[in-house]
């Protein structure tokens, strides 16, 4: 058990008050007593972003995730995909340098998953945010990633890191896509 030390990101100590990291979890998480707009604004208020900047960021995120008409709705009034879009908008609204996503689409059906994956690609392109996307879904990893890190069954052991040279958006039935998916599958089978 560590008793002392530092956590570094890009060589800089992580300070909870100044960190520029956002998170999206498998379980969509919204504050039930806040509206969609207030949920998206939450991280901006914690970071003490000016009202003008917060207003602009919230408007931009509502537009990008297609929830402008639902800004005054509460989480109990939203579908699962809408709740996940709120989580995505809240995470990107703070303009993080690093976004950690842990199985964010695990509970969604395939159509919603594809739609949100495409929205996520648009956000990545627009913001330039570095994203660590954790998934058990090989096709999702190949579809979204620039690099694929295959872990072993030991928590901190990396089996390999593969570059994904396929251009975005990716064609899931192309020979190149299928070949890379099969390569990742083979790596997982043989540890």
Place the predicted regions along the sequence by residue.
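Catalytic Walker B motif of ABC-type/P-loop ATPase nucleotide-binding domains
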Residues: 99-102
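Short helical segment in ABC ATPase nucleotide-binding domains corresponding to the A-loop/adjacent helical element
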Residues: 37-45, 55, 59, 163
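Conserved signature/switch motifs of ABC ATPase nucleotide-binding domains
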Residues: 73-76, 94
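Conserved ABC transporter NBD signature motif
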Residues: 4-16
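Hydrophobic anchor residue at the start of the ABC signature
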Residues: 24, 88
């Amino acid at each position: 058990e560590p008793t002392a030390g530092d956590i570094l990101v890009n060589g800089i100590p992580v300070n909870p008050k100044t960190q520029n990291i956002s998170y999206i979890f498998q379980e969509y998480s919204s504050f039930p007593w806040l509206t969609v707009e207030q949920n998206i604004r939450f991280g901006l208020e914690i970071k003490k972003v000016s009202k003008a900047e917060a207003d602009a960021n919230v408007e931009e995120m509502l537009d990008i995730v297609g929830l402008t008409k639902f800004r005054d709705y509460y989480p109990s009034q939203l579908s699962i995909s809408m709740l996940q879009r709120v989580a995505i908008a809240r995470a990107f609204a703070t303009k993080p340098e690093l976004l950690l996503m842990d199985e964010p689409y695990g509970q969604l059906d395939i159509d919603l998953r594809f739609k949100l994956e495409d929205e996520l690609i648009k956000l990545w392109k627009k913001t330039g945010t570095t994203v660590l996307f954790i998934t058990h879904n090989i096709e999702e990893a190949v579809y979204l990633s620039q690099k694929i890190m295959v872990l072993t069954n030991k928590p901190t052991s990396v089996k390999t890191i593969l570059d994904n040279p396929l251009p975005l958006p990716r064609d899931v039935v192309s020979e190149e896509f299928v070949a890379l998916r099969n390569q990742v599958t083979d790596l997982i089978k043989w540890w």
